[in-house]
Amino acid sequence: MLSLDEDYQAWEEYPQHRWVFNKLEVALKLGYKAGPACVPLPKTSNTLFKAIIRPIYNLYGMGISAKVKTFRPMIDNEFIINHGYISPGHFWCEYFEGTHYSIDYKRTDQPKGSLWAWEPFCTMVGEKEENNLTKFTKWVSVNPPKWNLPRFISEIDNVEFLNIECIDDKIFEIHLRTGNDVLHGKPVGSKAIPIWDDEQYNIKILEEQGYTFKGNHHPDSFKYNAHGLLSDLRIGYMIK
């Protein structure tokens, strides 16, 4: 089997599961309030609706083109149905607040559809600012949350690993590969602090605190700027 590091590889390897890359379809399967560009937002009792806007498909990852916005549906819907605020190829979804988990799962020998079909083996909690969804400041290895995956995820078969991202128990991304490799094999409590191109001064500071630098999976850092779509360039992590 191909060693999968990227979503585009998983797209080619698992054509039967390509629905997982459709983030709008995942949101609707999970019962979230969501819709593509041009679909009006639900009208709420408090007149405001906080949403995250993202590309329906983004096989590059890194939160490209994602942003949070609070709408006034009674006023803004007239613009939204004419492509105001939300560009073609994007969708809106209700915004969830809470702990950001990234969980790597491996397939067990339990049958397809079993509650125990997938076993978590590396869980990280990430920290970031709401006004910059691509620039994380810290990842910490933690024990996995105690919850059951939705049945439609348990029924994914012929795949070796999954990476699931969620806010508390609200899943928002599914990857047919691992995602937490930077802390694989590390004990609970281990930390990975991203080092960004404009913050390289932190390397020496963190080395004095016992951290060790680990470069990106791909040594060519330009591969992490999405051909200019990302303004923040990650060059690696400090691990402790």
What label would you give each PLM region?
Residues M62, Q110-G113, M124-N132, K138-K240:
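ATP-dependent carboxylate activation and anion-phosphoryl transfer catalytic cores
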Residues E6-F152:
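Active-site nucleotide/adenylate-binding loops and adjacent lid/helix of ATP-dependent enzymes
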Residues M1-D5:
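N-terminal non-globular leader segments, chiefly Sec-dependent signal peptides
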